[in-house]
């Protein structure tokens, strides 16, 4: 009993010397309580508690406040985004978009009559809702339809590229930055000029997909408010392609977003590897296969005669029965491979072996293959 009174007196003295909210006193009291917790654990009656600081909480939740632009996700955010399919699982996508960059470079040079350089900045996976919230405004969002895939895509043109294209097409001077007027909607002239550029990009996108699968892309509508350009659910995954367009000292960005639902009909084609100048072909393997086919061993049967007899006669056959054939020594027989006629010839004997001398060329026409089917 006296020990309990001594402990209570010591605790009261600590509380009077370290009032709540007192800076260093709180830390010392926290350390003391931690020590007592460890002493109580030894007795089996208490439990120690540790308060996480803000950095540890951010690390646990996966929030990166350093601003270094790293794409690595940790913590709960990594678990949430684990359902996203990486574009690297679709190897043909990178080939298609590389082809798109080359086509756009030529097309935009002809469209603007200026020196245009198109570069591929990044290809990544993102949730559609996160992308809508990250679109820089003001900008123009073009909703386009993939006819053969029966779905939609989204193309975003940022403000810098809009004013640069308008300035170039209307004869702006080189070496001067495009004039920007903020706080107003885009005019009809600006929207029409940007729409013409979008038509060029969609035509090049069609040509980029052509070797893989014919797809026609048609512009559906232009929007300036991201919620009105919703083509998928916020949680749906999509492929985001960022392109940089430079026209000497002017330029901007184009972002192309394709939901995975749009690419699903051609997903098997996107999974194949790129080989040679044509998609999915290997000339070395084709040559090897052709060589092996020429050396393939096949069984050929010589047919002397064919007759149709009743089933009852076949069932009553016994050892020693004789079958009369309607063939003579001068009548040509046939050579076949699994009932496919190959040639005709005469039956005879050569070096104590029965032989067939071919008297007609081997039928190389497609009829033989059709009979096999």
Swiss-Prot record:
GO molecular function: cytoskeletal motor activity
A Pfam family annotated for this UniProt entry: FliMN_C
CDD domains: FliM
Main location: membrane
Biased composition (Gly residues): 32-46
Domain of life assignment: Bacteria
SUPFAM superfamilies: CheC-like, Surface presentation of antigens (SPOA)
Topology with respect to the bilayer: Peripheral membrane protein
Cell compartment(s), UniProt: Cell inner membrane; Bacterial flagellum basal body
GO cellular component: bacterial-type flagellum basal body; plasma membrane
Family: Belongs to the FliM family.
Full protein name: Flagellar motor switch protein FliM
């Amino acid at each position: 009993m006296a020990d309990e009174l001594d402990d209570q007196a010591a605790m009261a003295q600590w509380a009077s010397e370290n009032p709540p909210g007192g800076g260093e006193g709180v830390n010392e009291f926290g350390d003391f309580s931690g020590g007592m917790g460890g002493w109580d654990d030894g007795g089996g009656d208490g439990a120690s508690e540790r308060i996480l600081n803000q950095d540890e909480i951010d690390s646990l939740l996966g929030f990166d406040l350093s601003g270094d632009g790293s794409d690595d996700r940790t913590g709960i955010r990594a678990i949430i985004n684990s359902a996203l399919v990486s574009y690297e699982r679709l190897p043909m996508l990178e080939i298609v978009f590389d082809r798109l960059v080359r086509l756009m470079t030529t097309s935009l040079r002809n469209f603007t009559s200026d020196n245009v350089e198109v570069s591929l900045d990044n290809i990544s996976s993102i949730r559609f809702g996160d992308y809508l919230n990250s679109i820089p405004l003001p900008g123009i969002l073009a909703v386009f339809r993939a006819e053969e895939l029966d779905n939609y895509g989204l193309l975003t043109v940022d403000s810098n590229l809009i004013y640069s294209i308008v300035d170039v097409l209307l004869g702006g001077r080189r070496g001067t930055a495009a004039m920007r007027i903020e706080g107003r909607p885009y005019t009809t002239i600006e929207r029409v000029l940007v729409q013409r550029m979008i038509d060029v990009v969609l035509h090049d996108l069609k040509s980029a997909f052509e070797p893989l699968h014919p797809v026609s892309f048609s512009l559906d509508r232009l929007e300036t408010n991201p919620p009105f350009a919703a083509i998928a659910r916020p949680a749906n995954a999509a492929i985001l392609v960022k392109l940089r367009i430079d026209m000497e000292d002017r330029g901007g960005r184009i972002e192309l977003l394709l939901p995975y639902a749009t690419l699903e009909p051609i997903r098997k084609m996107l999974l194949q590897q790129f080989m040679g100048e044509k998609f999915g072909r290997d000339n070395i393997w084709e040559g090897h296969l052709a060589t092996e086919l020429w050396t393939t061993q096949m069984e050929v049967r010589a047919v002397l005669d064919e007759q149709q007899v009743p089933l009852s006669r076949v069932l009553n056959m016994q050892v020693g029965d004789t079958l009369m054939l309607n063939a003579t020594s001068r009548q040509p027989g046939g050579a076949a491979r699994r009932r496919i006629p190959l040639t005709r010839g005469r039956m005879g004997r050569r070096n104590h072996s029965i032989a067939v001398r071919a008297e007609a060329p081997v039928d190389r026409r497609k009829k033989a293959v059709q009979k096999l089917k």
